[in-house]
């Protein structure tokens, strides 16, 4: 389940507010909430086996069961400090034998008339403003530069760590954001002998039921080979634009996202996405379509490429001609205010149907 769906009452958090969070302390301007969920599902997916072949595989799995703590304290009128920490490596389907050795989100921040600033590990600006409006689903996701879905290029979860982000207050509907990710020379994942800071930022404009957002990240902390590091080769940039419109219970969003590669033998990738979600009273039904253009130059002739039927390539040298048509459909049904079920199906248009599958599950929130 996407982190933005978790229930929490902290005003400074990016997660949605919900009634399930339990306020355990609220006195003298200090508030502490405890919240969480148990998510268990079943999936049947075309995946690679130990021999490198694609075959149908299934299992009962934990879909991100989480427990979280959120606190805030009024420092003085117009300035509030806050923190949030979540743990989601519980493996609820194998609780008796599975270890718990990983967290999910942890940050501290200040918010007030000046805006909002926070430091720690959390969803990126690209995830919140660009990717989530298209597919904020339970399990399956379309491909993107963060590694979701059957992504052909991705930076992985490391991009969410060691972040410092400032978001301005709204100026007649306009919000501005700027941030950095810093990796010091003591970081294990730092392949250089010095500290390094990336730069990311964006803008979001809201007018009534319509909003549009644009973000950019120079990904300056990433490399793929030691040779690239030694030659001072750049990894590449990523950027995106998303527009969305909310009409009663229907939300429709359009996305353009691009990884602009500076690496030898690694192609740039364009992601063109369309997503919709409709609340029917007892839950949501939703779907998304995305056209993935590997090796494309900016927008290119998208319609012509999509209808020409470029097929996946077996070799990296030919992969610049690949295009994929991805589809995801799903729905939820609310059993109660705290419990719901869901079912999803995904089609990624990869060779041997890799990644295609169906999944269903149940979630209980508190």
Swiss-Prot record:
- InterPro entries per record: Gram-neg_bact_OMP, Gram_neg_porin_domain, Porin_dom_sf, Porin_Gram-ve
Q: Which domain of life is it from?
A: Bacteria
Q: Which residues form the signal peptide?
A: 1-21
Query: What is this protein's function?
Result: Outer membrane porin that allows diffusion of monosaccharides. Also allows diffusion of disaccharides and trisaccharides, with reduced diffusion rate.
Q: Which SUPFAM superfamilies match?
A: Porins
The entry's protein name is: Monosaccharide porin
Name the protein family.
Belongs to the Gram-negative porin family.
């Amino acid at each position: 389940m996407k982190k933005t769906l978790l229930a929490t009452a902290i005003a400074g958090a990016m997660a949605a507010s919900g009634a399930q969070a339990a306020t355990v302390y609220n006195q003298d301007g200090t508030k502490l909430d405890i919240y969480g969920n148990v998510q268990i599902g079943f999936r049947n997916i075309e995946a690679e086996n130990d021999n490198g072949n694609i075959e149908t595989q299934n299992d009962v799995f934990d879909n991100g069961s989480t427990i979280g703590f959120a606190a805030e304290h009024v420092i003085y009128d117009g300035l509030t400090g806050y923190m949030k920490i979540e743990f989601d490596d519980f493996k609820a389907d194998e609780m008796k034998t599975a270890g718990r050795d990983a967290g999910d989100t942890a940050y501290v921040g200040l918010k007030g008339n000046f805006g909002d600033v926070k430091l720690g590990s959390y969803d990126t600006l690209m995830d919140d403003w660009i990717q989530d409006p298209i597919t904020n689903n339970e399990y399956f996701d379309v491909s993107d530069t963060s590694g979701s879905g059957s992504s052909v290029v991705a930076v992985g979860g490391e991009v969410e760590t060691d972040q410092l982000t400032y978001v301005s207050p709204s100026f007649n509907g306009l919000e501005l954001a700027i941030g950095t990710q810093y990796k010091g020379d003591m970081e294990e994942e730092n392949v250089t002998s010095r500290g390094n800071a990336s730069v990311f930022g964006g803008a979001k404009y809201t007018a009534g039921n319509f909003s549009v957002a644009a973000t950019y990240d120079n990904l300056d902390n990433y490399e793929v080979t030691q040779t690239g590091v030694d030659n001072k080769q750049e990894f590449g940039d990523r950027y995106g634009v998303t527009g969305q419109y909310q009409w009663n219970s229907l939300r429709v969003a359009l996305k353009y996202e691009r990884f602009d590669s500076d690496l030898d033998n690694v192609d740039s990738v364009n992601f063109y996405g369309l997503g919709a979600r409709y609340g029917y009273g007892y839950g949501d039904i939703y779907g998304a379509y995305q056209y993935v253009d590997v090796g494309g130059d900016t927008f290119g002739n998208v319609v012509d490429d999509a209808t020409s039927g470029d097929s996946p390539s077996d070799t990296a040298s030919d992969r610049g001609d690949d295009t994929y048509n991805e589809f995801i459909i799903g729905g939820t049904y609310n059993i109660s205010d705290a419990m719901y079920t869901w079912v999803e199906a995904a089609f990624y248009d990869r060779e041997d149907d890799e990644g295609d599958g169906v999944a269903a599950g149940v979630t209980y929130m508190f």
